């Protein structure tokens, strides 16, 4: 019998964690300021992690903590307390790449599940079984695996060893993220969450006897070639095949993404997964049109099926530019008596056509006839960041709804 796969979402902040849960994620993964592979200014504090666990658990969801950097000898002494603090905060699992960290997590928080990170590069069933023998509940498979090999891993591993795979988001041009380019070119280690993304830079070819003569490797509208630049992964059209290959957790990339991005992508994959689960033994899976429409309303690079069907077209894209056709302009805090109470995240004006995405996946389209500030003053637009305002809307709206507008 087919098990219902988990939809796993990224959470780079407490706010994003809450939106991911509200928009349909079964679990979220996040990090504290250290050891989390995202050395960004926004990560969770221990207090926020505790609050996030309470929020998620109250809604039947799980929280996983990433501990997937490769620590140095000097850093090892920090880990026991770090692991215990996270366990006391209520996390359901640790995501780990280093064998030493795996042993420390088992020693200092044996009650918390241990998941082996994609950074470990699990590409075959023997490696997966070793992780299981070392106490891992789950392995996050290498992103380079095709569906056929994932199915082989499933068939040759204990059934209680869970398999997790990435289904959407940015891809790294190196095998399982094992890249030294950032360290070499920018002094920032990608294996420690500090990647400067030199693979996104523009490159030209120089011949040693012709210094200063830069030759273009390929054609692009802005000159130069993005030969190392990867597309974004999108598997929604064949989510059924990933589930049937035996994947237990469908992972969305993006701990550095905004809460709008995460909510929108989670909403789309929630609908895709629920469509499959409604008739899982039908070999003619049809993705609802609105799923791809939703995925096109977030900032992204050109989409690719990744390596699931082989290597062709998995990596190279001709440009570093994003597709950004929509602007996120606000959140709905509450609704009553035909009036939506909102917070500004971007400017719009009276007469503009807007969309409101709700946590249940529904979309409300309207053109507000007026805008009113928090002190009751009628306004032509919403010029101030984070300002509170109201707009008329006859359709009831849910808290956590997101307001957006197509670029002109």
Feature locations, PLM:
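Conserved phosphotransfer cores of two-component systems
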Residues: 109
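Alpha-helix capping/helix-boundary segments
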Residues: 100-101
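Glycine-rich, positively charged N-terminal anion/phosphate-binding segment
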Residues: 38-57
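Gly/Gly-Pro- and Ser/Thr-rich, intrinsically disordered tail segments characteristic of DNA damage-repair
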Residues: 77, 112-123
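Phosphodiester-processing cores and adjacent nucleic acid-binding clamps
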Residues: 50, 63, 82, 96-97
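Surface-exposed amphipathic alpha-helical tracts and adjacent flexible/coil segments at the periphery
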Residues: 1-22, 27-34, 53, 59-69, ...
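Glycine-rich loop at the start of a catalytic domain that most often binds anionic cofactors/ligands
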Residues: 41-46, 77-83
